Amino acid sequence: MAKKILFVGFGRSGKDTAGEFLAEHCGLRYGGSTSWAALPLMAEFLKVHPMVAWENRHKNRELWKSHCDELRKDDPCRLIRLALAQGDVITGVRGLPEIQAARKESLFDHIIWVANPRVPVDPTVDFGIDECNGVVVNEGTLEEYHRKLAQMAAFAFSAENFSPYALKLL
């Protein structure tokens, strides 16, 4: 059974890049973000085409956060489960109740905080590094970030499905 990994952190820190790297180079399936899982519901709420909702999500961060909180009111893991149905690695959890419920239900083998000193504190994330069981720092080049991700993945699970690129980074 594949490992389940959640990457969290402030907006634009490199969470999606981490998920995409593990999918492309480490043999895991990337399920996208919880925002992606919420997209059809958000587009319906906003009464716009999903493409318009997605393209404007960063301009509407607080609205997305508040409506996604409403969507999760009765089931904190609702969006997490939707994303996990698409893959083993997901990103984008922003609420403390989500993290706590996911831990209680043992939905993930690893919850990794992506720390990036180049991005500002994100007010839509209401928990911190202390809720995670690992950290990866994204502060250099893309190749340096990939190296850290490959090393983390090799430590967390087998490297038998790694691409030649990921193996070279070890």
Regions found by a protein language model. Give the residues of each.
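Small-molecule kinase domains that catalyze NTP-dependent phosphoryl transfer to phosphate-bearing small molecules
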Residues: 78, 113-170
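Short, structured coil segments at secondary-structure junctions
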Residues: 26, 105-107, 130-132
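Post-Walker A helix-loop "phosphate-sensing" segment adjacent to the P-loop in P-loop NTPases
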Residues: 24-32
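Short, hydrophobic/glycine-enriched beta-strand segments
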Residues: 3-11, 30-31, 170
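Glycine-rich phosphate-binding P-loop
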Residues: 6-22
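ATP-dependent small-molecule kinase phosphotransfer cores
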Residues: 33-88, 94
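Short, acidic/turn-prone active-site loops that include or flank metal/cofactor-
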Residues: 11-13, 33-39, 114-121, 141
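ATP-dependent NMP and nucleoside kinases share a basic, alpha-helical "lid"
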Residues: 82-125
